[in-house]
């Protein structure tokens, strides 16, 4: 199987797991939580987690809860980012806050964030590893927020240096990819090497 097919296959697995994870009923918040995340996406970040697990000899299925958690956090940040940027479209569809309003979208994002931790706690790994994974995951979310804060400041500046821009992107975009790769490798019993 070539890499493109493997990525597609893993993305399909993630999509099915996301549907299961988001199968709540009864409140409008649940529809808001599902709107963007089940509306499509490449699933690059969770696929990286799964591939990293396999690359060090781990089993694909072992990393699925973590991969789902990574995608939940990614989408939680997108919900909040769309509100801040006043974006009306994402992935060719109306943004969540346009459909459900800003207050409900904020709490939907918060709920996706909480659900990510519920997914991580499904992992069958040693407590010491879980502690390291949870610490890195929490630091990742904080650094994403720091990157978003920098992004907000940059909107009112016309003197943003390349170094500042790369630092912002490193916190917002690269950090979640780093966590996906590191977490997947850790779940697969990879070493620091």
Give the residues covered by each predicted segment.
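Mg2+-dependent prenyl diphosphate-binding active-site environment of isoprenoid biosynthetic enzymes
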Residues: 19, 23-193
């Amino acid at each position: 199987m070539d890499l493109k097919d493997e990525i597609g296959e893993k993305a399909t697995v993630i999509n099915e797991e996301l549907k299961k994870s988001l199968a709540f009923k009864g409140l409008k918040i649940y529809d808001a939580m599902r709107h963007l995340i089940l509306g499509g996406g490449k699933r690059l970040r969770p696929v990286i987690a799964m591939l990293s697990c396999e690359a060090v000899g781990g089993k694909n299925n072992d990393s699925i809860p973590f991969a789902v958690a990574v995608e939940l956090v990614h989408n939680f940040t997108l919900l909040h980012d769309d509100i801040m940027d006043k974006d009306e479209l994402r992935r060719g569809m109306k943004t969540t806050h346009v459909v459900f309003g800003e207050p409900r979208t904020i709490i939907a994002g918060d709920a996706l964030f909480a659900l990510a931790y519920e997914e991580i706690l499904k992992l069958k790994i040693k407590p010491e590893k879980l502690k390291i994974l949870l610490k890195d995951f929490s630091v990742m979310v904080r650094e994403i927020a720091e990157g978003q804060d920098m992004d907000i400041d940059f909107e009112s500046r016309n003197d943003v240096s390349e170094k500042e821009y790369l630092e912002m992107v490193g916190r917002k975009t690269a950090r979640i990819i780093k966590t996906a790769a590191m977490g997947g490798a850790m779940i697969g019993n990879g070493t620091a090497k």
